[in-house]
């Protein structure tokens, strides 16, 4: 019974007629649905990606910290009673797809996020691989106490394409390397990008051009 705000990027040609693929873009801890717009400069990056020939897409940024709580996009995080994951799949995606001209289907739906949202995007794509064609996790948290264990989900079949991008100076660099090795050990195809950088918006803004291109290239026509 609560109001859940979100932000949306609509392509320049959006007219309420044509349908577009959709990217769900998740924020990090202590953030909100405005972060990718305000700090990540999403609008100019998305416009530039379109101008460079990328597929036009709708980009949706949910609020993953209701009441300012970091709940890692899961149900009952650390014993709280908030069923965020259930809300995301049962209410939020259907709401977006009925209120915007979204081309629904796995081949035209992707998910990405940073830090806590990197965890959320990996978790959701492992939980519902039939829902997403790609997941792009920037500086992801991969082992969270009180949240679902990603390592226990590595047996999931038919996973979407996966990219993990992380800075060599990031405090999560070691855990991301361990998760990359676990992906490889499970025979899960993935792209792993490391470059100079730390856990900050300068790094995450630098992820956006690659993220948008990878998702665009993966979307079905």
Where are these regions (language model features)?
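Non-catalytic cap/lid and distal C-terminal segments of serine-dependent acyl enzymes
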Residues: 1-221
